[in-house]
Amino acid sequence: MNSMRRLQTLVAVLLTTTLMGLPAGAQPFGDTDVPFVITPDNVTLEMLKLAKVGPKDYVIDLGSGDGRIVIEGARRFGARGLGVEIMPDLVRLSNANARAAGVADRATFREQDLFKTDLSAATVITMYLLPEVNLQLRPALLALKPGTRLVSHDWDMGDWQPDQTVTVAAPDKPIGREKSSRLHLWVVPAQIAGLWCGAAGLRSFSIELTQSFQSFQGTLRRHVGGQAQARDLAGRITGPVLQANNGSAALLTIKLDGDALRIIGAQSSLSALRGLSLRRAADGRCS
């Protein structure tokens, strides 16, 4: 890829600030944009815990190295998973490690370009990549099913701020001056920008929303007798759920349910809206 030289330069800078040459556990560059640097075992465990991985989850690890994240997810948490790795020797090692751990039926590994991987089945995606790669992946990650959890080791995703960040001691970390790791969690937000229209009895309602990642703003309008009463909304999106707040209190709780927004919670003067469903206006206006 055209970004190969820039990525190699970045990693070289990181490594030379800590050790002369590659440390133990870090593999030299091959036909890949991202080097293999081992994630310490305790960091692997904390990544899975941060994503709240469980038996119903399907974990995809991008740049899976020796397979430890997918294997640990299967062994300790009962999840199924796929490791995507471009280096064939690491894929062979990962499959051998899965067999040795007794989880080969739930942990599989594939030699594949991570940018060409179908991520749609994942409920959790883990990655230890590089900043530029994270940013290149970001559009595909934002397009995933709302509620998909993403955990990145050390690197963020630019102006898409994480929902949670934790710092974990990592005395066995092979690179970096600080023997700690920062783990970032994102929950993929529903894509809700636009005009939504609904009706309850003889009254019609609309919600017009704008969105910046997991934050939203908008206006709720109640249309009565040709007049519109408006109320501003602002809040946060967690997966398919929007929480519009009034100070510290929840004013409206709205859920994206298929192709409709459904008000599942309403407080104060808006309590009559509970149960209202609204659909996105196809032509940019409510009929």
Stretches with model-predicted labels:
Residues P55-G65:
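Conserved class I S-adenosyl-L-methionine
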Residues R80-E85:
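Conserved SAM-binding motif I beta-strand of class I
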